[in-house]
Amino acid sequence: MKAIIGKKVGMSQIFDENGKVIPVTVIEAGPCTVVQKKTAEKEGYAAVQLGYEDVPERKLTKPEMGHLNKAGVAPKKYLREFDLENAAELNVGDIVKADTFKEGDFVDVTGTSKGHGYQGVVKRWNAGRTPMSHGGGPVHRHAGSMGSTTDPSRIFKGKVGAGQMGCDQVTIQNLDIVKVDPELNLIAVRGAVPGPKGGLVLIKSTVKTHRIKHADSGISNNPQKASGRNPQKASARTK
């Protein structure tokens, strides 16, 4: 089990050995410093606290500086805790870099989705409009009926409505690492990652054991079966 803190750089694309385009998200992962180590004997569970991104001391509170000074670590802007099975292998002051992961690893990436402010039900929940004619007005983008009257005299849970959109913690599971650049501390993961450019993300080894099949994973290298169908059987069906 491995983990690291990073920032989203943006999206790009990488070509594999077959010339196929792989959309990737580039993440600046680490370097992170182990600030605290928790053990099952003392705290009841094994975990480590990582610090990321240096910051001036004046930006932190006295309790935060006391916590970092106790560990002998320079001031850090972000502190995050990870439950790791191999927490015993890490010690306070150790540096965790991008080369902790390798190409082919599957990870879960957690970030904060982009905030869109106060939005209506059409944009927020993809609700449908009322008819533009035949008495559908005067308001066409409202939420519609909220429920019954005397019975049940309430709005059922799950009813969509207007409100704050985005700015939620989102975790994308089972993203495979396509490329790792240890010199620049960059990790390229397949697909999209929540949050804007520069947003904080947490990368951790996936908790799921199954693997997601990609769109091109079932395509055969045999040109006669490139479409996934047997041409002989296909021709027999047309006769």
Role assignments for model-derived ranges:
Residues M1-K239:
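Extended basic (Lys/Arg/His-rich) segments that typically form rRNA-contacting surfaces
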